[in-house]
């Protein structure tokens, strides 16, 4: 368990991105002995392509593959997808059928399982909570890029702080579930499934899940809310999102040193073209280089980092 990473002991890491990164960088590498699932999900008809595969490839190149099981869920068979095939030996493909997966859980038989939404936010919230309840592990959005091994964090359940544009205190912090970790059938996972059907959500809701997480947090504080900068550095450093809103544009230079961060979350710009020289393209090239070096074929079990300055 990482000590001191809470509002009461170290409030400055929740309001100062640079201090949060320094704290994260000081977290020593570790070996988590239990096999851990890493869950991802993508639903067709939305195309699975170059942007989507980077989450998987960065996970493969930063986690200890002897201790993790990387699971790519989809509502269709992705085995013949041209972006999946080159990394297929490192991941497990599963079909996402919410009605079937809900059997034997608190959600079995609910109409919520067949409800669809235009932007896929609500279905994504349902997915992450159900698979973590049923199988345990880590969930990450498909627009998350992994920077380092999550092993030091895996002995605890966690989510992370929703930027710095919200009010933070020991009592109230808006919570982001783009990256989360829960144990199979845990009290937290059970509570979230229990309250999920009763929480109102409109089709245009983007923070329904945050409302749900905050509700459960009022009654159960035995899980960790990490600082935003651990997983979403730019959002914490730039209240108005700044350059992080344009990760695919050429010429958006970053002077940020993300050294210490566990991931980068680039926020849903699926339709934006990837320009050569953009932040995304430069990071993609770094991940591809590391992937090529390691899987021709050496797996380094320790200190699996992508490097220092991910923006430059």
Annotate the PLM regions.
Residues 1-124, 142-312:
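Glycosyltransferase-associated regions of secretory-pathway enzymes
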Residues 125-135:
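Small-residue hinge/turn detector
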Residues 135, 140-141:
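Active-site acidic Asp-centered loop
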């Amino acid at each position: 368990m990482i000590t001191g990473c809470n509002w009461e002991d170290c409030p400055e890491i929740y309001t100062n991105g640079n201090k949060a990164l320094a704290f994260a960088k000081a977290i020593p590498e570790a070996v988590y002995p239990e096999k851990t699932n890493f869950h991802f999900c993508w639903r067709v008809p939305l195309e699975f392509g170059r942007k989507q595969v980077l989450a998987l490839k960065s996970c493969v190149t930063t986690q200890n593959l002897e201790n993790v099981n990387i699971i790519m869920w989809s509502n269709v068979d992705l085995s013949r997808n041209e972006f999946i095939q080159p990394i297929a030996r490192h991941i497990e493909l599963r079909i996402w059928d919410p009605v079937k997966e809900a059997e034997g859980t608190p959600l079995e038989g609910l109409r919520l399982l067949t409800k669809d939404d235009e932007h896929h936010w609500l279905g994504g919230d349902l997915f992450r909570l159900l698979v973590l309840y049923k199988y345990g592990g880590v969930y990450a959005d498909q627009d998350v890029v992994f920077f380092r091994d999550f092993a030091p964090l895996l002995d605890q359940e966690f989510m992370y702080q929703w930027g710095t544009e919200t009010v933070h205190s020991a009592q109230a912090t808006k919570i982001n579930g783009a990256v989360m970790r829960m144990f199979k059938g845990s009290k937290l996972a059970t509570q979230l499934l229990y309250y999920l059907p009763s929480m109102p959500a409109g089709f245009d809701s983007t923070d329904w899940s945050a409302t749900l997480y905050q509700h459960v947090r009022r009654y159960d504080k035995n899980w960790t809310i990490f600082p935003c900068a651990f997983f979403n550095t730019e959002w914490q450093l730039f209240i108005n999102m700044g350059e992080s809103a344009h990760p695919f544009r050429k010429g958006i230079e970053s002077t940020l040193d993300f050294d210490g961060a566990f991931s980068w979350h680039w926020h849903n710009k699926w339709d934006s073209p990837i320009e050569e020289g953009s932040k995304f393209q430069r990071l993609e090239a770094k991940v591809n280089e590391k992937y090529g070096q390691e899987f021709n074929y050496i797996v380094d079990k320790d200190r699996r980092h992508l490097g220092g300055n991910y923006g430059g």
